[in-house]
């Protein structure tokens, strides 16, 4: 009997070592998180043309035409998102600034109805982006890579082999846990599940990954509020890489008239 227990223990040890080696053979957590972050934010020095749809009771309630510029200027990294249409929403803008010397961000928002540029703290970036199911942070620098992410293992999700990562954000105003499923081949997120402070599933995010010009990228993001059943969708219509972006569009003071900047015509007319 003792020999049988020893044999069983040896087998379990071999299986555990094999599993550990298989996980260890892949990229480390930092690499996975970095690539996931880039996938969600879009490529640097590029412009994304997108549609944002708000879904209520199963039907689209509103659709916004967005442009998003991602680039560097004045010693910082910036992501600017601007609503170009419809007319009643045109000019809504969100500017996210990431200092190159730190991981902290500074957020600016502009609502045409008030004609004011508002600067707010990073913690407020988790608030809803103008009544959609996305937060401001979802449209800016995604706050990942704080060191708390852990690789749980690999599994299959929606027919794709994925890495499963678990994160317990410290002092997060809304989330106690975030589970991410990242495709092993592209390191792009397939799904992310957000749990509230009480540990209940709050939101789910699903991403569609397609290969465009030989490069895997996210072409659709669906954020669903589990409690309300409502959702919001971002469809990436086009990505214009390696684009020279004028530095003045990243100036907070210019947000008041940013929708009329001539730069947007150079990218939207190329569709």
Residue locations for each model-derived region?
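Bacterial N-terminal signal peptides that target proteins for export
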Residues: 1-9
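Short amphipathic beta-strand and strand-loop transition segments with alternating hydrophobic
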Residues: 67-71, 150-156, 208-209
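Mature-chain termini and adjacent capping regions
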Residues: 25-26, 52-59, 144, 168, ...
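Bacterial N-terminal signal peptides
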Residues: 8-18
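Gly/Pro-enriched, hydrophobic low-complexity segments
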Residues: 34, 84, 95, 106-110, ...
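Gram-negative outer-membrane assembly/targeting C-terminal domains
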Residues: 247-271
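Sec/Tat signal peptide C-region and signal peptidase I cleavage site
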Residues: 19-24
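N-terminal mature ectodomain segment of secretory-pathway/periplasmic proteins
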Residues: 27-113
């Amino acid at each position: 009997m003792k020999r049988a227990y020893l044999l069983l223990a040896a087998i379990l040890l071999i299986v555990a070592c094999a599993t550990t080696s298989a996980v260890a053979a892949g990229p480390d957590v930092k690499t996975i998180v970095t690539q996931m972050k880039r996938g969600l934010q879009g490529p640097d020095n590029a412009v994304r043309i997108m549609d944002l749809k708000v879904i209520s009771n199963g039907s689209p309630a509103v659709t916004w035409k967005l442009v998003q510029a991602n680039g560097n200027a004045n010693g910082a990294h910036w992501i600017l998102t601007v609503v170009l249409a419809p007319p009643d929403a045109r000019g809504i803008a969100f500017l996210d600034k990431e200092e190159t010397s730190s991981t902290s961000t500074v957020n600016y928002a502009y609502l045409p109805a008030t004609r004011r540029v508002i600067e707010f703290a990073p913690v407020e970036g988790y608030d809803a982006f103008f009544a959609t199911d996305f937060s401001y942070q979802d449209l800016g620098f995604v706050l990942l890579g704080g060191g708390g992410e852990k690789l749980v293992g690999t599994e299959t999700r929606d027919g794709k082999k994925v890495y499963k990562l678990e994160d317990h954000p410290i002092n997060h105003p809304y989330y106690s846990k975030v589970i991410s499923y990242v495709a092993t081949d592209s390191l792009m997120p397939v799904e992310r599940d957000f749990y509230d402070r009480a540990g209940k599933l709050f939101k789910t995010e699903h991403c569609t990954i397609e290969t465009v010009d030989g490069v895997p990228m996210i072409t659709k993001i669906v954020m669903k509020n589990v409690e309300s059943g409502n959702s919001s969708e971002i469809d990436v219509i086009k990505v214009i890489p390696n684009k020279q972006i004028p530095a003045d569009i990243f100036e907070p003071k210019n947000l008041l008239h940013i929708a009329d900047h001539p730069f947007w015509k150079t990218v939207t007319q190329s569709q």
